[in-house]
């Protein structure tokens, strides 16, 4: 078509996001004489700062998460499986208008380090449960939260990690307002981890994290060893590796923007981000810390920046670890 209109050697502006990359690459290969000029700033701006009507959509998505989370809390007790908890969450949010039943994770083990899809784990006293709700969608707009559930008594180390992560989100939240530096918000969240002796610095470049390579830049090997898992073994399988491969957060940052279904992410809240918050920005802040075969936490809320400060879109379920009595 470009050749037909005499544009095979034209200079052409392109507007899109990362979902357009494969199309642009194909187009460039078919028209090697044409020059394509990036002009996506307007679209990137629209993804970064949301309109009041869009904020309503994100708010609804976050409320669906709260509805699902409350349903998950209601059914969780010793003897219940991860399938049943996941189903309770899914049925509740879908019944109120959620658009997908896949896009979030549940992880249960005695350490608090597991995160994935249900596989048949039976809840037991001492379990730590992570509800990592990375995507619930309303009219194409997504929200994200993370919650922890403790079943009965857990270890002192696990309590320490949960407390530091929870305090981090609450401390960072106080700084949310137009003009606030993203770096400052990130660093405020990691301060309780430093106080707890988990970290020495909030700087991403110095921070250990679960996906980090070896010091020489080579891939980090996952430790191969037998990890007892009665429910996994009841299915004829054996868990023969340790996750995470090393201690730290999943990634060395506090959070990121949320957007339309499909994984839009226009900014990260990290120590190296010197951008400032603007009214209409929507993001999740979730502190994470995992220690192999020991302790883990992933907990956070979804926020929109308002003229006066912020609105916690996921405030309908408390951030603090939900406690289940082991005998119930």
Which residues fall in each region the model found?
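Active-site neighborhoods and metal-handling regions in enzymes and metal-associated proteins
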Residues: 1-328
């Amino acid at each position: 078509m470009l050749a037909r209109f005499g544009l095979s050697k034209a200079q052409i502006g392109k507007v899109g996001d990362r979902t357009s990359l494969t199309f642009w690459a194909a187009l460039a290969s078919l028209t090697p004489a044409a020059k394509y000029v990036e002009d996506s700033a307007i679209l990137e701006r629209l993804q970064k700062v949301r309109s009041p009507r869009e904020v309503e959509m994100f708010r609804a998505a976050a409320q669906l998460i709260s509805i699902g989370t409350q349903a998950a809390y209601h059914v969780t007790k010793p003897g219940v499986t991860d399938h049943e908890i996941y189903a309770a969450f899914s049925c509740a949010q879908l019944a109120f208008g959620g658009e997908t039943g896949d896009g979030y994770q549940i992880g249960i083990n005695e350490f608090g380090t597991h995160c994935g899809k249900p596989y048949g784990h039976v809840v037991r006293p001492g379990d730590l449960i992570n509800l990592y709700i990375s995507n619930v969608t309303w009219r194409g707009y997504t929200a994200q939260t993370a919650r922890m559930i403790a079943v009965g008594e857990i270890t002192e180390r696990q309590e320490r990690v949960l407390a530091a992560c929870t305090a981090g989100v609450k401390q960072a939240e106080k700084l949310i307002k137009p003009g606030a530096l993203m770096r400052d918000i990130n660093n405020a969240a990691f301060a309780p981890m430093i106080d707890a002796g988990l970290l020495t610095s909030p700087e991403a470049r110095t921070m250990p994290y679960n996906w980090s390579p070896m010091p020489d830049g080579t891939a980090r090997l996952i430790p191969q060893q037998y990890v007892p898992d009665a429910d996994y073994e009841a299915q004829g399988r054996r868990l023969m590796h340790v996750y995470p491969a090393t201690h730290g957060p999943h990634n060395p940052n506090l959070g990121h923007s949320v957007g339309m279904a499909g994984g839009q992410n226009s900014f990260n809240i990290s120590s190296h981000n010197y951008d400032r918050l603007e009214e209409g920005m929507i993001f999740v802040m979730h502190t994470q810390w995992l220690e192999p075969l020991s302790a883990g936490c992933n907990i956070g809320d979804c926020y929109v920046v308002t003229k006066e400060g912020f609105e916690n879109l996921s405030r309908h379920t408390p951030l603090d670890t939900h406690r289940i009595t082991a005998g119930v």
